[in-house]
């Protein structure tokens, strides 16, 4: 890890969230290591404790991409984060959501980086042709 490394913590995440969102029914979790933030979000929402949850970790030991592909997740090297959202919508009504989320994320990240964040259809964000995110 480099000298500029800042460990994840809940307060750090809250600094980047909209105040209105923080006042809503949202739960935020940060861990040093987890199997998969996506699994954490699914498990949490199955308990229906909150309509919205954020799960972040310094490391994933069983991260997955599309079609069950392994997602390499070394400690402190990337942002491992899943957002869980409890919805009554059918999957067919969510068509295009990953592209919309990708567009918003790319636009937001471009404010913080000198390198252009791009979108690779259907669900990846890239910087300099290297994948930085997958949206599931």
Predicted regions and their residues:
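N-terminal lobe of the biotin/lipoate ligase/transferase fold
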Residues: 1-111, 133
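Acidic (Asp/Glu) carboxylate-rich active-site/surface patches
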Residues: 101, 107-136
């Amino acid at each position: 890890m480099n000298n500029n490394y800042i460990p994840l913590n809940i307060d750090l995440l809250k600094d980047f969230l909209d105040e209105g969102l923080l006042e809503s029914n949202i739960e935020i979790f940060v861990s040093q290591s987890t199997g998969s933030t996506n699994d954490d979000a699914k498990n949490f929402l199955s308990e229906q404790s909150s309509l919205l949850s954020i799960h972040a970790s310094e490391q994933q030991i069983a991260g997955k991409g599309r079609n069950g592909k392994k997602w390499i997740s070394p400690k402190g090297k990337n942002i491992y984060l899943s957002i869980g959202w409890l919805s009554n919508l059918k999957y067919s009504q969510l068509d295009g959501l990953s592209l919309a989320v990708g567009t918003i994320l790319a636009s937001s990240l471009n404010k913080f980086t000198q390198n252009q964040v791009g979108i690779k259809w259907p669900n990846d964000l890239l910087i300099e042709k290297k994948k930085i995110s997958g949206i599931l």
